[in-house]
Amino acid sequence: MITYKKLLDELKKEIGPIAKIFLNKAMESLGYDDVDDSNYKEILSVLKMNKELREYVEIVEERLEKEG
């Protein structure tokens, strides 16, 4: 199960502490208050729109899909 904390922890591994700001902004832009299995891919899609983050977000996405 994907949670806000799990997604944030995975993003921090690749991006660093600033991941929280990016994650919160992506969630805010979509109108989400929390992360779950039904919306995390949409949130990652928004994060991938930033070309500098795209590679790192794709790594996180692959890792989460392998676990799920």
From Swiss-Prot:
It comes from the Archaea. It comes from Archaeoglobus fulgidus (strain ATCC 49558 / DSM 4304 / JCM 9628 / NBRC 100126 / VC-16). This is Uncharacterized protein AF_1502.
